[in-house]
Amino acid sequence: EDLGMTFRVVTNLFEVLTAGTPIDLVDDLPLVRLGHQRPHPFYEPIKRVVDIVGASIGMILLGPAMLWCARRIVRESPGPAIFRHERVGRDGKIFQIHKFRTMYADVEDYAVAPTEASDSRITPFGRFLRVTSLDELPQLFNVLKGEMSLVGPRPEMPFIADTYDEWQRRRLSVKPGITGLWQILGRKDLPMHENLQYDFYYIRNRSLAHDLSIMVRTIGAVLSRRGAF
């Protein structure tokens, strides 16, 4: 795949049909098609336009809500309303991700992220922001700057990305996103290995139609609050 090559493997027809794997028939013999899968040539430039337009509209429509959130955060726990933390972007490039602060300013430590809703570092309003995913809204700035996309794999912390095996580093071949398959299919309810599987599936099958589907389904995921805390 890294060399851009495609090869085919003989397998059982019924095994691959249920897996949704692309196959070719050669003399009635099912061959699984493996290798490098590139999106449509216009996918990347159109996706960037969609990101810019979508993030701009989002900031205009959600601007009042973002200002309200910022005021509530500072009122409850004096300090900056937005925190910046290092994440790993496309091709391993480090960038500063923007989020609404959800922890008390004097105990802010995002090197170890909260793993449960009862974490004492989270403020009452911060818990509301996390459950409703409103804490993610400042990432629209990252999208406008070209560091993130509206849809993509979850942005990873550097100390976790440093432990990646070579095959896991393929997550870094595309821009991370505000939402993605991991976010709409369970978020923190999912084990880490399933998160990676969803990210790899997205990378191999990314398209504008797929991105649009994920954005629409994100609305339902946010309203259901599944896996959020």
Residue map of PLM features:
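A residue-level signal for conserved active-site and pocket-lining positions in enzyme catalytic cores
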Residues: 7, 184, 212
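Acyl-group handling in specialized metabolite and lipid biosynthesis
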Residues: 37, 200-203
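Positions in alpha-helical segments
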Residues: 55, 70, 83, 123-127, ...
